[in-house]
Every structure is written in structure tokens, then in C-alpha cells.
Amino acid sequence: MAGEPWVVAYRFEDRLTGGSLVYAPCVAEWTASLDAALTGAGCVVLDGTFFHDDEMLHATGQDRPARTMGHLPIADSCQRLRSHTAARKLYTHLNNTNPALAEDSPERTTLEASGIEVAYDGLALDL
């Protein structure tokens, strides 16, 4: 939509099974258009580049907030993602500074408690 921040999201629908997947690898802000794309999807794979907006500052000393690089932090998108009815919800493209990469981190525990997974290399998704 005109005037909204950049959001890249692709919706795939399997005509044979009726299954659908939304892959949103670049989410600068949660928009009404993104909400509409996710509605009714069976699986959602969302931008999980950073968990916290100030992650780069703490990890590298560089003051580069996640939002200024076009990535809505997981801490700010998790509740919105949780509100959708998809059977599977995953974050992908996690930066090496993202604490949710560690399976024993509080951030990963928060996601898992919300029914949200972290995608991994070799993951196969059925629609």
C-alpha cells in the first residue's frame, strides 16, 4: 500500500492440498498489508534477523538499530505473529547476533512457549 514501510512477503498456495504458506523475509514494520497476507495462512515464515532493536550495539558496539536496517525485531513482532492462526509459525534469517539462535536462551524459550519455531538449515515444510 502507498505510504507504508517496505515489507517483502510472498504467499504460496497449493491448489491440490489447499495449504498455504507466507514467507516474509524482510519486515520493516508490521503493516495492515502484512496482517492481510497472513490471514488464513497455514504456515508463516517471518523475518527474524534481530531479536532486540539494539542488538548490534550490544554485540558489536555499532549503534545500528534493527529498525534502521529494515528489520522489525522479534521482540516487537512476536505478539502480532502469535495472534495469527497458522498451524506453524517460524522465524528465519536470524543474524549471528540474535540470542534466539541458542537453544537454551531465554529468547528461544519465549518463542517456544508462544508456539513459534526457529527455522533451521534443511527444514522441509509441507502445505
Regions found by a protein language model. Name each.
Residues D14-L21, L127:
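Beta-strand-turn-beta hairpins that frame and shape the catalytic cleft
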Residues P5, G18-S20, A28-G122:
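Cap/insert and terminal regions of metallo-dependent hydrolase folds
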Residues V8-F12:
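Short beta-strand scaffold segments in enzyme catalytic cores
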